[in-house]
């Protein structure tokens, strides 16, 4: 499944319980079409004590959300935006903001 965002992109959640939150993409899972966004879709995991974490307990971590629920955030126009692809003279393919024309 094709995903329109990449790791380290800043995105805005456009639907669901975390609607309106902004965060950085930590991980992209193209096989399922999901992304993990920092500070979004937090779930509690019950961690057993092990060698790395002797204490154990309940930890909060980010869970994956569908990539269709996020939009790329443009730093120039400060809005969530769609993207288009543009071919440069040197043959490089870049992502461009549909609202202001800024390249990502």
UniProtKB/Swiss-Prot annotation:
Cross-referenced InterPro entries: KOW, Rib_uL2_dom2, Ribosomal_uL24, Ribosomal_uL24_CS, Ribosomal_uL24_KOW, Translation_prot_SH3-like_sf
Key words of the record: Ribonucleoprotein, Ribosomal protein, RNA-binding, rRNA-binding
Keyword Ribonucleoprotein: yes
Entry GO terms, CC: ribonucleoprotein complex; ribosome
Signal peptide range: none
SMART domains xref list: KOW
Single GO BP term: translation
Pfam families: KOW (PF00467), ribosomal_L24 (PF17136)
Molecular function GO labels: rRNA binding; structural constituent of ribosome
Domain of life: Bacteria
SUPFAM superfamilies in the cross-refs: Translation proteins SH3-like domain
Assembly and binders: Part of the 50S ribosomal subunit.
Function statement: One of two assembly initiator proteins, it binds directly to the 5'-end of the 23S rRNA, where it nucleates assembly of the 50S subunit. One of the proteins that surrounds the polypeptide exit tunnel on the outside of the subunit.
Family: Belongs to the universal ribosomal protein uL24 family.
Protein name: Large ribosomal subunit protein uL24
Organism name: Clostridium perfringens (strain SM101 / Type A)
Organismal lineage: Bacteria, Bacillati, Bacillota, Clostridia, Eubacteriales
